[in-house]
Amino acid sequence: MLKMNNLTLEKKAQTRNLRKTLQGIVIRTSPKTIMVEVETAYKHKLYAKRFKKRKKFNTHDEKNLAEVGDFVKIAECRPISKTKHFRLVEVLQKKGEI
């Protein structure tokens, strides 16, 4: 078994790819899982009309911190299950807060 010193671990951490992070609203909760709806704005290439697309992501929420209506930040991670490939990073804003 190979032992790694701190320098090689730091180098590995620096070369690791950045994970995709998204922000969205929680639309459904269940134990350790939330469904987050992410809205992105696009511009049509030919007609230059702006439009919005919405996509839903199943997200892992280990501590059950998020509730329906919360604005959250999620990050891409290894596959946790068949449909879960994101994890909850933080709750940016609770439902009742302004």
From Swiss-Prot:
One Pfam family linked to the record: Ribosomal_S17
Keywords: Ribonucleoprotein, Ribosomal protein, RNA-binding, rRNA-binding
Coiled coil (residue ranges): none
UniProt cross-references to InterPro entries, sorted A to Z: NA-bd_OB-fold, Ribosomal_uS17, Ribosomal_uS17_bact/chlr, Ribosomal_uS17_CS
One record GO biological process: translation
One GO MF term: rRNA binding
Family according to the record: Belongs to the universal ribosomal protein uS17 family.
Entry protein name: Small ribosomal subunit protein uS17
Organism, as annotated: Mesomycoplasma hyopneumoniae (strain 232)
